[in-house]
């Protein structure tokens, strides 16, 4: 009986370790995604922060913030990105549903599109959420997005001075 209990606890510990490792190393952006965003960038990227503001959900809802550090200089090409699809969603109306890199701050019309995230109270409780708002108003920075509908969109904010990319995923919340 003690042997069975020990093996069970050992297996649960190993399984817990694997789940923890997968959670900590998960990144929604891969090298191909960075090539879409920054076509000439070949450097390394480190995920330095991630926050899931909803937690576990049975309804596939997302509200997540990721912060990446670009390890080499990035040049912004205002003709990119050219999204054809994003996270398995085909972009049908490219002019309305996606954007090339634009200089911050956002105009009133686009702020209205993303108001539920930009004005979200959960950002007040998170250091990087607060920084996101500050960086969004700095004229030296850039943003772009993929807008599926008011319940699903993906927002990118690039802090040029620090070489950091904020990535927000929002779906169904």
Predicted ranges, named:
Residues 4-20:
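Hydrophobic membrane-insertion alpha-helices, especially the h-region
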Residues 10-11, 15, 29, 37, ...:
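Generic detector of leucine side chains in alpha-helical contexts
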């Amino acid at each position: 009986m003690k042997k069975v209990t020990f093996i069970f606890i050992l297996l649960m510990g190993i399984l817990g370790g694997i789940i923890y490792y997968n959670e900590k190393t998960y990144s929604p952006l891969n090298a191909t995604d960075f090539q879409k965003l920054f076509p000439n960038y070949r450097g390394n990227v480190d995920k330095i922060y991630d926050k899931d503001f909803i937690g576990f959900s049975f309804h596939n809802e997302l509200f997540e913030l990721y912060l990446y550090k670009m390890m080499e200089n990035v040049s912004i090409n205002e003709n990119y990105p050219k999204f054809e699809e994003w996270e398995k969603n085909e972009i049908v109306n490219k002019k309305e549903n996606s954007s090339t890199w634009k200089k911050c701050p956002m105009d009133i019309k686009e702020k209205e599109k993303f108001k539920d995230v930009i004005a979200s109270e959960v950002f007040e409780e998170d250091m990087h959420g607060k920084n996101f708002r500050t960086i969004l108003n700095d004229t030296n920075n850039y943003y772009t997005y993929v807008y599926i509908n008011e319940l699903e969109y993906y927002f990118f904010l690039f802090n040029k001075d620090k070489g950091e990319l904020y990535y927000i995923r929002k779906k169904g919340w």
